[in-house]
């Protein structure tokens, strides 16, 4: 983390439980981010907050530290049963819930508090076995939590702390009725610690906060600009015929350590994936049709560096928290201006530099004026040499193909991707096909 991303406030200066301080210290957390520095003094006084903060600002650690400290400093409800969690964290997507649970384990291993996670797309029985053993902190998506509540597997009458993360997304995805259903089954708002976080504190989000929280204090970390100064933006105007070749050429030229390619439709994402896969790149595909177990595996491979490129739709990528993304490629300009900000905001996080490359083709160029008005600046235009684009591109790989023991096209016997003439393309260490710069100002 860079110094500009952190405040001067140290976690050690807070009156936190010693086990929490130990966990933070072992994980390398010394200084707070601004949202942590502002929210924790309020939360540690057992006061509710409604926080406005963008993804990547450290809000997850803020509410996890507050939740763990609250449970450790508050007596367990008398007569609490095994099926009664003491805290609940609601997330709009399973990917975000999984990420929160991973972060929570850093604190759980030192404090003795048990963490459980539930979300759709996974076996009810597998998740139920965890719940049957009892959990202190329940993390999950609202739909699956409601299923277990209605079955009597979970009882919310002992909840002492509750977190609603990315509340604005909850509205966008139509989960507000679910949230109100769950709040009505918890103890009174005054008897629990309530935390709400949202990228924007719109009137509907504030109404939700005041309906189900105890006079929450507002904590606002609003960026001065919708897009970070750490992100270098550029836009190209390719023809439809050259669009794919331009993408492949730029990826070859940029050789990104970790990149996400966004496209507007499932079909387009599959097409992009097939060309990248055929060209020997280590690439994963995330669309709404990808089964949940495969989604999790792809995300783990991407996070661990086993995949270098992720191709995704906006819906499939919602709630993803992946660090160290160096490049974002908007193969299609999004129809929604906010999606542009969300997309490129996945790079340039925590004070690091990032690159955003967008294509304004014939089909989506009309989206550009609204996007530039929304972000209050023009995106620098970069020209390119059509004659310099790659022309020795292998045929794309079919999306739905059978796997067998024979080596696939573009792969060697070890299963690792290969580049041109069998050169290894994976790992960002293999030789590239050219050194020619294709960008022209």
From Swiss-Prot:
A motif (Q motif) lies at residues 9-37. It is found in: Cytoplasm. One of its GO terms (molecular function) is RNA helicase activity. Signal peptide: none annotated. It catalyses: ATP + H2O = ADP + phosphate + H(+). Belongs to the DEAD box helicase family. RhlB subfamily. This is ATP-dependent RNA helicase RhlB. It comes from Shewanella woodyi (strain ATCC 51908 / MS32). The gene is rhlB.
